[in-house]
Amino acid sequence: MSDIIYFLHHSGFIYENETSLLVFDFYKDTENRLETLLKDSTKKLYFFVSHYHADHFNRDIRRWEERAEAYIMHKNCWLTMDREEKKHLMVPGDTLTIGDLTVTMYGSTDEGGSFLVKSGGKTIFHAGDLNWWHWAGEPAADNLAARRDFFHELSRFSERQVDVAFFPVDARQQAAREWGVMSYLERVEPKLLVAMHAFGKRWLPSYEFLWHYPEQKLWIPEKDGDVKETES
């Protein structure tokens, strides 16, 4: 059976496998994908929040508190819950096991962390705000520090192959838009790369990207609510 990915908005996705619904960085769900799934599904529901930025974290997720198995969040996320035992706060380097779900938090080059999740026999990586944040017009020292920090975080990755990787391709970076994702692909081989965090015009891979990674399978959602089946 294929797993299914639902694009919510920005960096928000639902990853559905045979037993679970994994919700990453829920911010908006304009097409009500989650509510629709929950009407007919008894699968275990997990929320993942990489950090507290408003485009990655919506406190409204607590309205599913009774339905959810767990809320797995970076420790900088503040969320008041009636069922505090369902809340699991992590920092980079932590590993958490809940049932058949194993979660490792890696670092970020902005706020919070990134998630490596093993569930249903698959390995899923969600980068959060981990990226090579090079900005035209910023001081050279700042951009050099951003480069150093990014490659330092990449060096920590022990998993060289994943089934699905969600990674930022931010339009605001202009010429540097692909620097982070291309460097990530030099370190890790995802069977499917999913573009996120566009912040503007939808990413169309450059000739350089396609020349370097001609065999890389991509999903670049076009609109909120888009759906992708993964290969078995």
Annotate the PLM regions.
Residues 12-48, 52, 59-64, 130-159:
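Pre-active-site segment of Zn-dependent metallo-hydrolases
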Residues 11-16, 113-117:
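Short beta-strand scaffold segments in enzyme catalytic cores
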Residues 68-124, 215-232:
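Metallo-beta-lactamase
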Residues 29-32, 52-57, 77-81, 96, ...:
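Active-site environment of divalent metal-dependent phosphoester hydrolases
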Residues 23-27, 43-55, 71-76, 125-128, ...:
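Active-site neighborhood of phospho(di)ester-bond hydrolases with catalytic His/Asp-centered motifs
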Residues 1-5, 100-101, 160-162:
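Beta-propeller blade-edge signature
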Residues 109-186:
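Active-site-proximal loop/helix segments of hydrolase catalytic cores
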Residues 5-11, 85-95, 156, 173, ...:
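Binuclear metal-ion centers of metallo-dependent hydrolases, dominated by the metallo-beta-lactamase
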